[in-house]
Amino acid sequence: MRSFRRTASSLSLVVLLAFSTALARRAFPQTNSQSSDTILIINAQLADGTGAPLREGALRIRGNRIVSAGKLSPTSGERVLDAHGLVLAPGFIDIHNHSLQGLDSDPLAETQIAQGITTAVQGPDGESPWPIANWIAARRKNPAALNVAVFAGHATIREQVMGKDFKRVATQPEIEKMAQLTWQAMNEGAIGLSSGLEYEVGSYSNTAELVATARAAAEHGGFYSTHIRDEADKAFEALLEEIEIADQAHIPIDHSHIKLGTVGVWGKAYEYIRVISEARERGLDFLADCYPYEAWHSNIKVIVPDKQYENSKSVEKALADMGGADHLTITAFKPNPSYEHHSLAELAKSNKLSPVEMYIRIIREGDAANTEAGVIGHSMIESDIKAFYQQPWVMVASDGGIGVEHPRGAGTFPRVLGRFVREKHWLSLPDAIRKMTSLPAQRLNWPDRGVLKEGAIADLVMFDPATVLDRSTFVNPQQLAVGIEKVFVNGQLVWNSGKPTGARPGVVITR
């Protein structure tokens, strides 16, 4: 209990103390009026994160650690919180999150903690802060409501070495310098290497460059998270390159946002899974993450893999592969905001152009302003998503983040729990929770997170399995999820009954 200076009015002191005690009791009903750093959560359905069946019980936390779980009774002085039969699980770990800028503007991370995320890994797809040490120091000075970790981005490192002269294969001395910088980033606290090989900077790298940088990360105990070179017609070829990199670098894999993103590969999920399963059976440490939507969010150039953005035939094929121009929607375009929230087909019609001509116009307008249009592409099918999610080696991850103009930024984890578990019965509840907790913790080599066990970090989420659901949409992507009742980060309550508490106990987790 906070102490107060003696004032002239003892009555004022009594009133103030009574008021503060009442507030504390509203958040945590107590067995007595004594304060304590121990919290007992009773009457919970405990999901331990391993995939084991849920069990009724209680969980005791002291400070930032879980002390015990099971059949427990209150002890004198500890705060008691009644879960009233709700599920209590480890906090969700988002292994692919884009909140680098959002954490500065919104450290309470409301869209993230409202869906149960307690740790968000930054710097995926090859783009990370630099230097890593500076970013970590800044985050520690300005903590968020959730924990963060960070990749060393391959494209970021490539630009450090090659500058703007990156549109070519790197020389051997340049590759060696990239490996050295990867070493530096890992020494400074990065948890692995990420790459984005569909994006411009990373797309010019060859396999040898990626092996060299991945090997440097592996030597420091890191893993390789990759947005592979193609998720469309050449998805199988790109997958084989990923496997080759992992084999040569001796590094564990996280295949980012596994998908089959064009008409030509729709329905081939089980063929794709077979290639991965064969690699896993011979010993490759291969996991993947997946978001629960049939639409992706990126820049407008990624749909043309040969980079011939003003070639009519290349653009025509790209749009056909997506299923048509009505499947591509502009989300952000600074040179002409009037394009935003319209499909390419709608824009073409209103401007009396063909979809190909409209695409090329947007490319030219963007290049003139040194920017690119943000787009959402509706180019996956549900049966492929289902097949991927039902694999035991696939994790849940958002590929979203604070302020992202895609519903996955605010809805990913509740969407899986509400739609894929409760409504569609694709997954059992324990298995879905495992994909959000202990499986990403395994990839990150964090044995004290992602599980409910004695000694583990008290990152926790309490939710109602009957009501948890995403509410974010493509029209309103920031709408908060429902059904997440309470979230604890490092033992502190950060989300309570639909509102942030204002606490910011998040830490930076380093390798």
List each language-model region with its residue ranges.
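Short, small-residue-enriched loops and turns at beta-alpha junctions
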Residues: 199-204, 230-235, 261-264, 294, ...
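Active-site microenvironment of metallo-dependent hydrolases
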Residues: 19-57, 62-63, 72, 113, ...
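N-terminal secretory signal peptides that target proteins for export/translocation
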Residues: 1-6
